[in-house]
């Protein structure tokens, strides 16, 4: 009979005793300078078992183990198992009441502890597990001094507590066969008697079962490492070498922490297992590229399925693609991917993961309701129709074509908004940690015809002043923007008969109040006397935001309002009061009372604030203290380089540029900064952007790495080590990313656009100097002809000449002016850099597939929906196909002669430069004969249109309407606009051959076909 067969039938402790008999002199445990053989360990186990045995321990009796991590703790667990009991290891850092409550719930009689902790557990019978008791028997090792209770594979060896989502943690009953299944799965980990396994987990953590018992079951050595060593990457690295450790199991968070400081920390190990959270592909890539262990294992498994359920041997090829599968099940473990009806789903389809086999725990001790929910018996999954016991993991996964399983998300309450998967439970956790609320529920709201949004209903604490604004600021420091909920304070939350928050009742009330508010807004908009402005505005906010109980001092934006919803506010205010407010007025007076006072004042703010010019000029000097240590940059196209750092890769231009980059043989690798919480999410967002524009072909995507970060955060939100490593890796920087919003003020663009550019400058000047190529906008010069009468704008002109009319422009353009000035200031110091100023970027010249959120697309599509178009004479919109820009960027940046220059990426010939009137005529030829009206009449028709709230021009309306100079709007200031000089651009592209740089009739036809295919405009064929 094999060892494994014997252990499978006899149980976990029998396996340990096998090695006591066969390898007594092998090392069993190492704790600092103290080392103990299996013979010596058994002596101490017998010592303690002899004392504990006097208490007549019943089979599977729960024995509390409150002993610090160390040799004494290992002895305690082994002694309990020797007598047939169940180990209940607990964390001594827990509060006394929590520990005592949990032990009491298990009807615990005996607690093993140490002298210093004994007083904490006075209500239980305590037995001390100190070093003293080892001296009771100094007569050496005696085999089977204390007869072992033979228990078998179904013996409950441990009770571990999970951190339950509600109330008291759930006690999980772990069985012997679940642990031995792990110990003898040689495909995942194969320990030899000469191996040394690190024990770094708290004994109450399920990973400790792997560290202690798979090691002892295989006759290997446990090496205990204290917490202060584990959390110090340098100390951990030194200890791994000092103690010749061969295997370690680390959480994802710890792995990320260690690798960020020492990429090759695990190079001497045979096995590194990691799990507990979604793995970060970029971290795995760093490990595999910088001295990897022999095997890097991505492990997955809930406590209820004995720590490791599935495993995957990670490869460099996979992580470069952003993939970190959780792999395949261990031996004697079965996995099922099922739909809501518990039927298997097809390969590639997302379903919930269910687990069967020896891995599955007995259940939650004394929790029948929880067991009924999580541990199921079904017969249709077995071949012979016999019952199969499975555990419901609550995790959404899919089967890949390789046969490996990929983790997708948690199933509980998950919602997807604007491409991001959001777990309301995570938001609830953040709210509760704020100490500002005593209760909360976070719900996704789906309203017909409207975008899904998140509302957080919070019960404020009564022991102090409460402010939604403070709570909002607290969340913004901890959650990414896409997870920010709309906040609503409530006095209480309804409960079910089981005492849980009644989410259905909360949602029903919310939907009723929102619907009622919408009806009141509809009625009051057509009635002159609709009550005071505060009451009316509160009703309007309830309708627009989808929340109620709005405080007078609540900020529209802190409640979750977006610029699109702010535009809807302005429409309703104009229809109700005949008052055309500006978007800036909402940002200046965002509270209910503040905006109501603006309405009551009865006039719109149209005066340009020239004092803001000082802010722009001051910000343009932010890089003044950044030195350029070398004016030489590497040739990024050379065979030894080819490493590109790219921002904006999920934007329209960025996706096309990324596609061009990776198709070039001289580009070896591209690292893309993507706003996301982790690398896995960043990779998915990046691939989603490529798919959105039909660019998601598989070729060469292995060159691409997505880095989770944020342009506007210091050092992109990376650690100093990560930022420095990125700087050393990079050959060239292409800064294409930007926040683009035509109605938000400068302050809303400042972080991403200005500080994002500053971060790129820091990256370019950290370590070796790298060339920095910045994509600005042709609009950065503003309506120069209106103010100066100029007829041509030179490419290398000093932007300072245009600062006088900067206050008249929109916040986006102001931020680009500041950002470009930062680049020019660094060029003056010798930084190798190029500035590009593209015009309005349209779809590609082959397919016409473009960004329908951009200005000109909104104008065209919105006007077609309206049936009217504005008369705007002599307005060139310098429209260019996106593929012209990507080609020009790559060609121009390939020549160092172009460093320090600026290039206008606009139509290169007068024939290709299509003005707005010509565009309307081309649309007419394509079947869209729009009625031409004066600009102000067009605005009036648009603002009164019954379908305005669904017109793509709605978010643009404030900036289209607002008069900024002598009753002229910003768009009108661009009449008779100067032409853009293209001398630099034409010279640099002369050897590239003929490039299409404008939008003609056939180009527009392809755009229209794309709009029709997307359902944005009706067909005119």
Curated annotation (Swiss-Prot):
Ranges for the region named Adenylation (A) domain are 17-418
Give residues where O-(pantetheine 4'-phosphoryl)serine occurs: 563
Q: What's in the domain note?
A: NRP synthetases are composed of discrete domains (adenylation (A), thiolation (T) or peptidyl carrier protein (PCP) and condensation (C) domains) which when grouped together are referred to as a single module. Each module is responsible for the recognition (via the A domain) and incorporation of a single amino acid into the growing peptide product. Thus, an NRP synthetase is generally composed of one or more modules and can terminate in a thioesterase domain (TE) that releases the newly synthesized peptide from the enzyme.
Q: Region labeled short-chain dehydrogenase/reductase (R) domain — which residues?
A: 646-888
Q: What is the primary gene name for this protein? A: asaC
| UniProt record similarity statement | Belongs to the NRP synthetase family.
> What sort of enzyme, by top EC class, is this?
ligase
What EC number(s) is this enzyme filed under? Answer: 6.3.2.-
Residues that span the membrane, as ranges? none
- SUPFAM superfamilies recorded: Acetyl-CoA synthetase-like, ACP-like, NAD(P)-binding Rossmann-fold domains
Would you tell me the protein name for this molecule? Nonribosomal peptide synthetase asaC
| Main function | Nonribosomal peptide synthetase; part of the gene cluster that mediates the biosynthesis of aspergillic acid, a hydroxamic acid-containing pyrazinone with aliphatic side chains that originates from leucine (Leu) and isoleucine (Ile). Aspergillic acid has antibiotic properties and was shown to be lethal to mice.
One biological process term from GO is: biosynthetic process
- Pathways per UniProt: Secondary metabolite biosynthesis
Checking InterPro entries in the record gives: AA_adenyl_dom (IPR010071), ACP-like_sf (IPR036736), AMP-bd_C (IPR025110), AMP-bd_C_sf (IPR045851), AMP-binding_CS (IPR020845), AMP-dep_synth/lig_dom (IPR000873), Far_NAD-bd (IPR013120), NAD(P)-bd_dom_sf (IPR036291)
- Identify the keywords attached in UniProt to this record, alphabetized: Ligase, Multifunctional enzyme, Oxidoreductase, Phosphopantetheine, Phosphoprotein
Q: What is the lineage of its organism?
A: Eukaryota, Fungi, Dikarya, Ascomycota, Pezizomycotina
Query: Molecular function terms in GO for this entry?
Result: ligase activity; oxidoreductase activity; phosphopantetheine binding
Q: What induces it?
A: Expressed during the earliest stages of maize kernel infection.
Q: What happens when the gene is disrupted?
A: Abolishes the production of ferriaspergillin and aspergillic acid.
Domain Carrier residues, every copy: 528-603
């Amino acid at each position: 009979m094999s060892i494994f067969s014997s252990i499978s039938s006899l149980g976990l402790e029998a396996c340990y005793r096998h090695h006591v008999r066969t390898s007594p002199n092998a090392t069993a445990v190492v704790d600092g300078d103290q080392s103990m053989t299996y013979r010596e360990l058994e002596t101490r186990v017998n010592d303690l078992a002899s004392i504990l045995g006097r208490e007549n321990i019943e089979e599977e009796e729960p024995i509390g183990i409150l002993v610090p991590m160390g040799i004494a703790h290992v002895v305690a667990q082994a002694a309990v198992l020797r007598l047939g009991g169940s180990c209940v290891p607990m964390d001594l850092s827990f509060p006394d009441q929590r520990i005592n409550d949990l032990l009491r719930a298990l009807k615990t009689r005996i607690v093993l502890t140490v002298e210093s902790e004994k007083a904490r557990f006075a209500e239980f019978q305590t037995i001390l597990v100190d070093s003293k008791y080892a001296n009771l028997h100094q007569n050496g090792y005696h085999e089977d001094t204390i007869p072992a209770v033979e228990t078998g594979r179904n013996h409950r060896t441990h009770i571990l507590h999970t951190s339950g989502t509600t109330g008291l943690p759930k006690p999980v009953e772990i069985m012997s066969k679940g642990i031995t299944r792990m110990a003898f799965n040689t495909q995942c980990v194969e320990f030899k008697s000469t191996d040394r396994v690190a024990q770094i987990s708290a004994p109450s953590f399920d990973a400790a079962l792997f560290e202690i018992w798979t090691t002892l079951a295989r006759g290997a050595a446990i090496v205990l490492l204290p917490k202060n060593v584990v959390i110090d990457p340098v100390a951990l690295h030194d200890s791994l070498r000092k103690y010749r450790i061969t295997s370690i199991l680390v959480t994802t968070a710890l792995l990320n922490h260690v690798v960020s400081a020492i990429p090759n920390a695990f190079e001497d190990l045979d096995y590194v297992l990691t799990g507990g959270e979604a793995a970060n592909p970029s971290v795995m890539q760093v490990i595999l590229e910088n001295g990897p262990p022999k095997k890097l294992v991505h492990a997955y498994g809930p406590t209820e399925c004995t720590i490791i359920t599935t495993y995957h041997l990670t490869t460099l090829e996979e992580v470069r693609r952003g993939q970190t599968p959780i792999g395949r099940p261990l031996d004697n473990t079965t996995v099922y991917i099922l739909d809501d009806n518990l039927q298997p789903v097809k390969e590639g389809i997302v379903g919930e993961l269910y687990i069967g086999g020896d891995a599955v725990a007995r259940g939650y001790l004394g929790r029948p309701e929880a067991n009924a929910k999580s541990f199921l018996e079904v017969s249709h999954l077995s071949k012979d129709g016999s019952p199969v016991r499975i555990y419901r993991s609550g995790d959404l996964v899919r089967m890949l074509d390789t046969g490996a399983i990929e983790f997708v998300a948690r199933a509980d309450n998950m919602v997807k908004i604007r491409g991001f998967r959001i777990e309301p439970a995570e938001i609830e956790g953040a709210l509760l940690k704020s100490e500002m609320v005593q209760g909360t529920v976070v719900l996704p709201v789906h309203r017909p015809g409207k975008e899904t949004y998140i509302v957080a209903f919070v019960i404020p604490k009564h022991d102090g002043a409460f402010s939604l604004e403070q709570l909002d600021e607290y969340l913004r420091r901890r959650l990414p923007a896409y997870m920010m909920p709309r906040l609503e304070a409530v006095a209480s939350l309804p409960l079910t008969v089981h005492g849980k928050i009644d989410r259905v009742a909360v949602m029903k009330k919310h939907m009723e109040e929102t619907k009622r508010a919408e009806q009141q807004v509809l009625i009051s908009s057509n009635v002159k006397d609709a009550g005071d402005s505060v009451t009316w505005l509160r009703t309007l906010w309830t309708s627009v935001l989808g929340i109620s109980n709005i405080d007078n001092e609540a900020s529209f934006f802190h409640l979750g309002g977006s610029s699109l919803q702010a535009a809807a506010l302005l429409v309703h205010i104009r229809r109700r009061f005949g008052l055309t407010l500006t978007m800036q007025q909402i940002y200046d007076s965002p509270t209910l009372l503040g905006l109501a006072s603006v309405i009551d004042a009865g006039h719109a703010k149209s005066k340009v604030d020239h004092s803001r010019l000082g802010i722009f000029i001051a910000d343009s000097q932010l890089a003044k203290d950044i030195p350029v240590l070398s004016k030489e940059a590497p040739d990024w196209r050379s065979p030894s380089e080819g490493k590109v750092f790219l921002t904006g890769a999920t934007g329209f231009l960025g996706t096309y540029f990324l596609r061009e980059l990776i198709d070039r043989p001289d580009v070896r690798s591209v690292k893309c900064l993507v706003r996301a919480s982790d690398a896995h999410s960043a990779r998915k967002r990046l691939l989603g952007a490529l798919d959105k524009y039909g660019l998601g072909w598989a070729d060469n995507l292995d060159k691409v790495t997505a880095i989770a970060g944020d342009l506007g955060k210091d050092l992109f939100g990376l650690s100093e080590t990560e930022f420095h490593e990125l700087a050393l890796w990079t050959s060239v920087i292409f800064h294409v990313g930007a926040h683009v919003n035509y109605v938000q003020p400068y302050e809303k663009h400042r972080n991403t656009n200005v500080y994002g550019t500053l971060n790129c400058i820091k990256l370019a000047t950290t370590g070796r100097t790298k060339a920095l190529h910045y994509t600005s906008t042709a609009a950065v010069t503003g309506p120069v002809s209106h103010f100066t009468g100029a007829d041509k704008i030179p490419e290398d002109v000093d932007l300072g000449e245009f600062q006088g009319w900067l206050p008249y422009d929109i916040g986006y353009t102001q931020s680009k002016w500041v950002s470009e000035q930062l680049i020019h200031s660094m060029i003056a110091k010798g930084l190798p850099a190029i500035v590009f100023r593209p015009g309005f970027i349209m779809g590609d010249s082959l397919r016409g597939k473009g960004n329908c959120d951009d200005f000109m697309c909104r104008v065209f599509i919105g006007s077609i929906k309206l049936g009217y178009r504005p008369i705007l004479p002599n307005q060139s919109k310098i429209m260019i196909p996106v593929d012209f820009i990507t080609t020009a960027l790559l060609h121009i940046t390939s020549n160092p002669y172009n460093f320090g220059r600026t290039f206008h990426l606009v139509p290169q010939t007068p024939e290709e430069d299509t003005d707005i009137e010509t565009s309307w005529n081309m649309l007419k030829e394509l079947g869209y004969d729009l009625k031409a009206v004066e600009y102000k009449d067009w605005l009036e028709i648009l603002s009164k249109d019954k379908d305005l709230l669904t017109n793509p021009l709605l978010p643009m309306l404030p900036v289209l309407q607002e008069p900024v100079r002598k009753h002229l709007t910003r768009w009108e200031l661009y009449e008779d606009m100067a032409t853009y000089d293209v001398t630099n651009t034409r010279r640099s592209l002369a050897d590239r051959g003929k490039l299409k740089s404008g939008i003609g009739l056939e180009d527009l036809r392809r755009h229209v076909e794309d709009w029709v295919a997307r359902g944005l405009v009706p067909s005119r064929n």
